Amino acid sequence: MNSLEQVKGLIKEEIQAAVLKAELATEEQIPNVVLESPKDKTNGDFSTNMAMQLARVAKKAPRMIAEELVANFDKAKASIEKIEIAGPGFINFYMDNSYLTDLIPTIVNAGEAYGETSTGKGEKVQVEFVSANPTGDLHLGHARGAAVGDTLCNLLAKAGYDVSREYYINDAGNQIHNLALSVEARYMQALGLEKEMPEDGYHGADIIAIGKRLAEEFGDRYAKADEKESYEFYREYGLKYELAKLQKDLESFRVKFDVWFSETSLYKNGKIDQALAVLKERDEIFEEDGATWFRSMTYGDDKNRVLIKNDGSYTYLTPDIAYHRDKLERGFDKLINIWGADHHGYIPRMKAAIQALGYDKETLEVEIIQMVQLYQNGEKMKMSKRTGKAVTLRELMEEVGVDAMRYFFAMRSGDSHLDFDMDLAVSKSNENPVYYAQYAHARVCSILRQGEELGLATGGDVNYKLVTSEKEVELLKKLGEFPAVVADAAQKRLPHRITNYAFELAAALHSFYNAEKVLNQDNLELSKARYELMKAVRTTLQNALAIVGVSAPEKM
C-alpha cells in the first residue's frame, strides 16, 4: 500500500469508527465508505457523502449526522488537520501538512520503486499488441498501438501484475504466400529474367532489395531449383527479412516483446485440430452446406461463424480460436488484446469462442486503437512527402523523435481519434506537452546542480517541516498522488492517465519555481529541505516518464 492510500484507508477506518461511536448504525448496516478528491481544493483533499448514505438507517437529517460524525472522528489518527461540513451534509477532510512532508524522504529513498503498488497481486496478464503482418513497414496505426501497448505493459508491471508482452506473427495466411511470390518475381527480375509480379503482390522497395540481395548471394541457384524447394526458400527468406526489419524498428521505438508467436506453429503442433476437437466434444460446432460452423450465436454473436469452408480451408477465425486456447493453456489470468478499430466487430465472436471452450469470456479484454491523422503546417498530411506513400513508424521517428511519438500516442485514450501535429511535436514551447514535462525534469536537475554547489548534497539532518508554503504543499500533494494514479490507471487500463499526471506534476513544479526562490544561500536550512523536495520531484517525474517510455533529460 502506498502513503496516500494509507491516509485514505485511515480516514475510512475512522469514519466507520465514528459511526459506531455515535451509534448511527450497526457494523453490518454501515455502507461502503466512498472518498473522493474534490477538483476544487478549497473543498478539502478528500470528501465523503457518508452522512447522506446513513440518513435512512439513522433516521436523522444528513447535516445532523455529519455533525455527529465529525464530533466522533479522531483527526490525529488519520493525519487530518481540519474537517468541514458543506451543503446538505458533505464532509470535507483537509490533510495535515506535516504528514505530507514525510513523503519527501519516502520518495527519495524509494527511488525507481516509488509508485509501485501491489494492486495486481501478481496476476498473470498477457498483452498481445502490434501483431502486424510481416509483409511491409509498420504504419501509424501500428505505431500508436505499439506505444499504447508498451505503456500499458509498463503500467501493469508497476502496479504489481506479472506481464508478458506478445507479438502474434501472421505467417500462415495468403499474405505470406503473396510475399513469397513477390520475392521470387523480384529475384528473377534481378537476374534479368522475365517474371511478372503476382496480382496481389507487394511492390515495395524492400522486396526489390531482397530480390537484388538474393541474386548477388545465390546467383541463379533458386531459378533452377525444384519449385517446391525454391518456394519454401523465398517464403522463409522474405519472412525472416521482414520480421528482422519489424523487430529493429520496434526496438528503436523502445518496444521489446517477450514472445514472438508464430501462427504456423499452430498448424505444426496440432493446436488447431485440438481446438476443433474440444469444440466438437462440447457440441459447439455443426455441419451445414459442406462447411463446419461454430454456434457463436449461443454466446451472443449476431450470427454463427464458419470455421472450415466447403473447400476444406480454414477461415481466419479458426487459427485465432486455437491461438487463444493456447494462451489460456499457458496459465494467464487475463488476456489483453490491442486491436485496430477495424477489428471492433471481431470482439463478440472471440469472446464467444473463449466461452465455448469452457473459459470465462471476461478473461479476454480488447482495447481498441483508433486511427491517427498527421498534420503539418496546419494541413492534413495523407502521404509521405519523401516517398509518396503512407508515413511509416520509421519515418516519423526520424522526423519528430521517439520521445514525442511515444508521449503523443499515449496521451489520449486509445479509443479516441488522434490528431498528431508534427510541428507541435518538435516545438520547444510550453504548448508541446512532452517538452513541457521534460523541461520540468531538466529544470529540477539544474536546481539540484545548484544545490550541490551550495553544499546541500552532503547529507545530515533535514527539517522537512519547513516545507509549508502554498505552492510547496500543492507540489507535495501531487507527488503523493502518484502511486494511487498508477494503481487506478492499471486497474482501468488507462495508460493516458500517466501522461496526464506527468503534465500536472510538471505544472505544479513550474508553478512552485515561478512563485518561490527555491534555493537561498541566506537560509540554508530551508534550502536543504527544498533540495530534498526537488530530489523527490525528479524521482517521481522520471518514474512517470519511464512508464510512457520517454526519456528524462538532465539538460535541455
Swiss-Prot record:
It catalyses: tRNA(Arg) + L-arginine + ATP = L-arginyl-tRNA(Arg) + AMP + diphosphate. GO terms for molecular function: arginine-tRNA ligase activity; ATP binding. GO terms for biological process: arginyl-tRNA aminoacylation. PROSITE patterns: AA_TRNA_LIGASE_I. Keywords: Aminoacyl-tRNA synthetase, ATP-binding, Cytoplasm, Ligase, Nucleotide-binding, Protein biosynthesis. Its EC number is 6.1.1.19. The keyword Protease does not apply. CDD domains: Anticodon_Ia_Arg, ArgRS_core. One of its GO terms (cellular component) is cytoplasm. The keyword Zinc does not apply. It comes from the Bacteria. It is found in: Cytoplasm. A motif ('HIGH' region) lies at residues 132-142. It holds the Pfam family DALR_1. NCBIfam families: argS. Monomer. Belongs to the class-I aminoacyl-tRNA synthetase family. This is Arginine--tRNA ligase. It comes from Bacillus cereus (strain ATCC 10987 / NRS 248). The lineage of its organism: Bacteria, Bacillati, Bacillota, Bacilli, Bacillales. The gene is argS.
